[in-house]
């Protein structure tokens, strides 16, 4: 979101049409799962049907096994730290840049090969990444721009979320400083979903009134001063707004 907003001025997510790609390189993105809201399996499947002896090829660089990794022609297991360095290495080869990179030697040959094939694919190549880091996503955008990737769409963007990690971090800082008097939470469970939930809980304890609207006593509701029950969809008849 941050990277797309920086480049295109809109807080949204890039959409992809994998049926237009002859080479797909994924760095930590399970695009056959629920990545960016899911729904990419259909266009991916179209490109995987052999036509005239050819079909799309798929390289997956990831830490844990995913649906996308299982479907890939080549899967290269690596840590998130190495994935970031792999992105830089691919960027250097595709764009002809010389950004400093510290990729482990055991990955260098394979990543170089992938990058060279991606560059050769040109507009028929596409790179995606699930790394939650602005700089990493800026590299992804830059690589696809240089490739002029047909599968990379900035017109039909996905507006499924607009959250900001920076704003959440600032909220936690303000809570810890005692600057937040009342916090109302609805449809979220930050104590469970945030990577550094301990800091959130620490800050929440300094908020005088915290209200969690929830269907059940989840992790956030249990540590809030007020846990307010909300009706489920069979009870609300779509006439309740919170």
Give each language-model segment a name.
Residues 1-242:
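Cofactor-pocket helix-loop regions in the catalytic cores of large enzyme subunits
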